[in-house]
Amino acid sequence: MAKDNFNSPDYYAIDKLFSEENILIRNITREWVKTNVSPIIENAVQNDEFPFDFVKGISDIGGFGPFLPEKYGGAEIDLMSYGLMMQELERGDSSLRVLSSIQSGLVMKLIYDYGSEQQKLNYLLPLSKVKW
């Protein structure tokens, strides 16, 4: 079981620039990674495995389309919060950040921007809740 060694000093007091929402979203994601990813990811990588429970976990913390309106399964978070969420997923494993950002940015965002209302209703909520 790998130890979570993340303990980075904030030399430039960057945390002071973040809103309470930014910090809350970062900390929720960080805790999920620390609890669910860090203990098993090294072994999974060494065995060429991807724990698919991670997909449900990312959905549970709102990691698919979090910047979209609630009507479509998002939480309407700002882009700073989204970036902090992606940073924390990346800290756990690059594949997690890729999974979330590709589904959110290249799939869901395009449906939201260019899809009909019916397409948005048909696809965005199921994609945010991994009910494909």
Where are these regions (language model features)?
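Mature N-terminal segment immediately following signal peptide/propeptide cleavage
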Residues: 19-34
